[in-house]
Regions:
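N-terminal secretory signal peptides that target proteins for export/translocation
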Residues: 1-53
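Short, intrinsically disordered, low-complexity terminal/loop segments
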Residues: 2-3, 75, 494-495
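Intrinsically disordered, low-complexity segments enriched in small/polar residues
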Residues: 39-40, 49-50, 60, 70-71, ...
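Basic side chains
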Residues: 54-55, 405
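Sec-dependent N-terminal signal peptides
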Residues: 55-66
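C-terminal segment of classical bacterial N-terminal signal peptides
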Residues: 66-75
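Well-ordered beta-sheet/strand-loop patches within structured domains
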Residues: 79-184, 189-211, 218-495
C-alpha cells in the first residue's frame, strides 16, 4: 500500500504557516520576472548574456513554483497565480495569449502576408478573355518542361513546415517552388524556411485558391503533391474549355460564375466590372452548369422551400427540434396559396407532411438573405445573399444545396439595376434600410452562365489551379472537396 503522507524531510523543510497574502508579499520581493524600467544596459546585452538571463529567469521561475508546492498549494493554483502576475511573460519573452487573441493575431499576420503577395496576381482581364488564353498557352509550355524533367518530389505525409524550420523537407518545397516560379532563383535550395520561402508559399497558396498562411499546412501539402503531369493535363483540359466558352463573354452585359473557383465576374462588352466570392453547392448537391437570363431582383424575399429540401432537410430538422420552425420563422401550408396552418396542430410524423409547402418570412435571418436575383431555369437555381457571411472567409466554399450565394450581392444588384429608371444605388440602400419587400423587373434581361473551369493563367503569366470539387476533370490527383480545417458544421436547411 502506497503511503501518501509527506516525507519527513519535506515536513522539516516546510516553512512556517503564513497567510496567502503574506506568502505573495514575500515572493513578490524576490520576483525577478516582474516588469521593471528598461535601461540601456538591458537593451545592449549581447546574445550570450541574454541567453544566460533567460536561463536564470527559468531557474528562478522554478524556485517560485517550488515554494508554492512546499507551502501546500496545488500545482494548478500555483500556475494560475504565476500567469496572472502583472506583466507576466513566459521564459521566451512573449506574452501569453488567450485562444481568441492568438486567433486574431494569426488572422492579422495572414492578412498582412496576403496583402504583400496579392498585388502580384491582380489581373484586370476576366477569366474568359484572349489574354487568358495566351497566358494559359505559355503556362502549358512551362509545365511541359517541368514534367519532362521529372516533375517534383512529394512532401511526406503529415509533414507541416513553417518559418524557421530546417530539414530536408524544406528543401523539397524550395525546389518545387523554384520550378513553378513562386520562389526567386537566387533564394536557392537550402534546408532553411526563411522569409523568402514564406512569401513563396503564400504565392503558391494564392494561385491554388488556398488560405494564405505562408506555411505548409495540410491542404497546401496535398496541393504540392499533385504530380506535374496531372497539373499539365489540367491546364490542357481547361484551355479547351475556356476556348469553347469564349463566345459567352461576347454579349454586352453578362454574369459569369466559375463554380470550382467560387468566383463571380460581371462583364460589360468583355471588360471586367465586378468580381465577387461566392458559395456553391456541396458535392452531393452540385451547382449545375447552366445558362439563363436574369429577369428580376427581389429585395427582402420570401424563401419558398423546394420540395426536395423540405423532405430531406426541413421536416427531419423540425422533428428533431420542434422549436426550429418558429425560431426560423417558417410557415406551412397544404398547397401554395392556401392559408398557413397552425404548426402546433400539425402531426410532423405523418407521411402527409411530405406533401406540405413551406415558406420562410423575409428578413436578415432568411436563408436567401436580403436579395434574390432570379434567373429562371430547369434546375431552379439562382443567385442570392446569405445571413452566413462568415462562409466567405473560407477558401473552399462548397456549402449550399446548389444555389449560389454572392458576397458582393448588393454591388451586383446595383450594377444590374443601373439601367432601370428610379433605381440608383441610394434607392437600393434605402429599401434595404427600411426592410421593404420589393421586386424590380429588368427592362433588358442579363445573360448569366454557371461554368466549370479548374485551371487558367493570369495576365502576369501565373498558372492558377482549383480542386475539381465535382470530379468532372477525370484526374484523380485534383479531384475532391477538401475544406479548410476550421470549416463550420452547418445546418443542411439551405438553398
Amino acid at each position: 500500500m502506497t503511503n501518501s503522507a509527506p516525507h519527513e524531510s519535506l515536513k522539516r523543510a516546510r516553512p512556517p504557516h503564513r497567510s496567502t497574502a503574506a506568502r505573495e508579499r514575500v515572493i513578490a520581493r524576490h520576483d525577478m520576472t516582474r516588469p521593471r524600467p528598461a535601461t540601456s544596459r538591458d537593451r545592449s546585452l549581447p546574445p550570450m548574456r541574454r541567453a544566460g538571463a533567460r536561463r536564470l529567469i527559468a531557474i528562478l521561475s522554478g524556485l517560485v513554483l517550488a515554494a508554492f508546492a512546499l507551502a501546500g498549494a496545488p500545482p494548478a493554483a500555483a500556475q494560475d497565480w504565476w500567469t496572472k502576475l502583472p506583466g507576466f511573460e513566459p521564459f521566451g519573452g512573449k506574452k501569453t495569449l488567450s485562444p481568441e487573441e492568438r486567433r486574431a493575431q494569426n488572422e492579422r499576420a495572414r492578412d498582412a502576408l496576403a496583402q504583400r503577395v496579392a498585388p502580384e496576381f491582380q489581373a484586370e482581364q476576366p477569366l474568359l478573355s484572349h489574354a487568358t488564353i495566351r497566358a494559359l498557352e505559355a503556362a502549358i509550355g512551362r509545365y511541359q518542361a517541368i514534367a519532362a524533367a521529372g516533375g517534383w518530389q512529394p512532401v511526406p505525409d503529415k509533414v507541416t513546415l513553417r518559418l524557421n524550420d530546417s530539414d530536408g523537407n524544406v528543401s523539397i518545397v524550395r525546389r518545387h517552388l523554384l520550378m513553378t516560379g513562386d520562389l526567386p532563383a537566387e533564394a536557392g535550395t537550402t534546408w532553411g524556411f526563411d522569409n523568402a520561402l514564406e512569401s513563396a508559399v503564400a504565392r503558391y497558396q494564392l494561385r491554388h485558391g488556398l488560405r494564405i498562411t505562408g506555411f505548409v499546412d495540410r491542404r497546401t501539402r496535398l496541393a504540392l503533391n499533385v504530380p506535374a503531369e496531372e497539373r499539365l493535363a489540367q491546364l490542357r483540359q481547361n484551355l479547351g474549355r475556356i476556348t469553347a466558352l469564349m463566345k459567352l463573354a461576347e454579349a454586352g452585359r453578362v454574369v459569369m460564375v466559375n463554380v470550382p473557383a467560387f468566383r463571380l465576374e460581371a462583364l460589360d462588352r468583355g471588360s471586367l466590372v465586378l468580381r465577387s466570392n461566392v458559395v456553391v453547392g456541396r458535392p452531393d448537391r452540385e451547382t449545375p452548369e447552366v445558362s439563363a437570363r436574369i429577369i428580376e431582383v427581389n429585395f427582402y424575399p420570401y424563401w419558398r422551400v423546394p420540395d426536395s429540401i423540405a423532405r430531406r432537410d426541413l421536416i427531419p430538422q423540425i422533428r428533431k427540434d420542434p422549436g426550429y420552425f418558429a425560431r426560423e420563422r417558417f410557415a406551412v401550408m397544404r398547397t401554395w396559396g392556401a392559408e398557413p396552418l397552425d404548426p402546433s396542430y400539425v402531426n410532423w410524423n405523418s407521411p402527409a407532411v411530405s406533401d406540405y409547402k413551406f415558406r420562410q418570412d423575409p428578413g436578415a435571418f432568411n436563408a436567401l438573405g436580403v436579395v434574390r436575383i432570379n434567373m429562371p431555369n430547369k434546375h431552379t437555381v439562382y443567385l442570392h445573399d446569405t445571413p452566413l457571411k462568415e462562409l466567405f472567409d473560407q477558401s473552399a466554399r462548397a456549402f449550399s444545396s446548389g444555389c449560389v450565394r454572392v458576397e458582393r450581392v448588393i454591388d451586383l444588384a446595383s450594377w444590374l439595376l443601373q439601367a432601370e429608371d428610379g433605381w440608383p444605388r441610394d434607392k437600393i440602400e434605402s429599401v434595404l434600410r427600411l426592410k421593404l419587400s420589393e421586386t424590380v423587373k429588368l427592362k433588358k434581361a442579363v445573360p448569366v452562365h454557371f461554368i466549370y473551369v479548374t485551371a487558367w493563367a493570369s495576365g502576369t503569366g501565373a498558372a492558377h489551379f482549383r480542386q475539381d470539387i465535382y470530379g468532372r476533370d477525370g484526374l484523380e490527383g485534383v479531384a475532391g472537396n477538401d475544406l479548410d480545417d476550421d470549416a463550420p458544421q452547418l445546418s443542411s436547411v439551405t438553398p
